[in-house]
UniProtKB/Swiss-Prot annotation:
Record's keyword terms, sorted: ATP synthesis, Cell membrane, CF(0), Hydrogen ion transport, Ion transport, Membrane, Transmembrane, Transmembrane helix, Transport
Keyword Ion transport: yes
Cysteines engaged in disulfide bonds, as pairs: none
One Pfam match: ATP-synt_B
InterPro entries: ATP_synth_B-like_membr_sf (IPR028987), ATP_synth_b/b'su_bac/chlpt (IPR002146), ATP_synth_F0_bsu_bac (IPR005864), ATP_synthase_B_chain (IPR050059)
GO cellular component assignments: plasma membrane; proton-transporting ATP synthase complex
The protein, known as: ATP synthase subunit b
Keyword Cell cycle: no
Family indicated by similarity: Belongs to the ATPase B chain family.
Source organism per UniProt: Bacillus pumilus (strain SAFR-032)
Bilayer topology: Single-pass membrane protein
Subunit structure of this chain's protein: F-type ATPases have 2 components, F(1) - the catalytic core - and F(0) - the membrane proton channel. F(1) has five subunits: alpha(3), beta(3), gamma(1), delta(1), epsilon(1). F(0) has three main subunits: a(1), b(2) and c(10-14). The alpha and beta chains form an alternating ring which encloses part of the gamma chain. F(1) is attached to F(0) by a central stalk formed by the gamma and epsilon chains, while a peripheral stalk is formed by the delta and b chains.
């Protein structure tokens, strides 16, 4: 075991170590200047790009949320407006129904009054015609009675005959 450090130290050349160390430092400096800076620049660009994309996505998400809320508000307003329109249409329909019913009642009353007036008029005409017939029959009967002097029974029989004739002539 005591020979092991001697073996390790025997093959070391300090000049080679220093040369390799200097070459390594120069290589690291060159890598840093020509490879690491562009690599870090590319990584920084990529990081900025990803950050911008995330920021843009967040802004779009916020805009989408805002638009969604606006659409919800518009939809709610449209529903309320349609509900109001339906209610107004129902009220107008009820009002028109009542107006139609009222107009029908008024027309019915007018027709009833017209019919009553017509009935009264025809009744009066019938009574007037009947009075004329009664008057002419009375005159006719009276003239016949005057032509003949009859006893009561014959006079009654004569009146019945003339009334019967008058009824048949109608």
């Amino acid at each position: 075991m005591s020979q092991l450090p001697v073996v390790l130290g025997a093959g070391l050349n300090t000049g080679d170590i220093i040369f390799q160390l200097i070459a390594m430092l120069i290589l690291l400096a060159l890598l840093k200047k020509f490879a690491l800076k562009p690599l870090l620049g590319i990584m920084k660009q990529r990081e900025d790009y990803i950050g911008n994309e995330i920021s843009s996505a967040e802004q779009k998400h916020v805009q989408a949320e805002k638009l969604l809320e606006e659409q919800r508000v518009l939809l709610k307003e449209a529903r309320e407006e349609s509900h109001t329109l339906i209610e107004n249409a129902k009220k107008i329909g009820e009002k028109q129904k009542e107006e139609i019913i009222q107009a029908a009642r008024q027309e019915s009353e007018r027709l009833k009054d017209s019919a009553r007036t017509e009935i009264v008029k025809e009744k009066e005409q019938a009574v007037a015609a009947l009075r004329e017939q009664v008057a002419s029959l009375s005159v006719l009967i009276a003239s016949k009675v005057i032509e003949r002097e009859l006893d009561e029974q014959a006079q009654e029989k004569l009146i019945q005959e003339y009334l019967k004739e008058a009824g048949e002539s109608r």
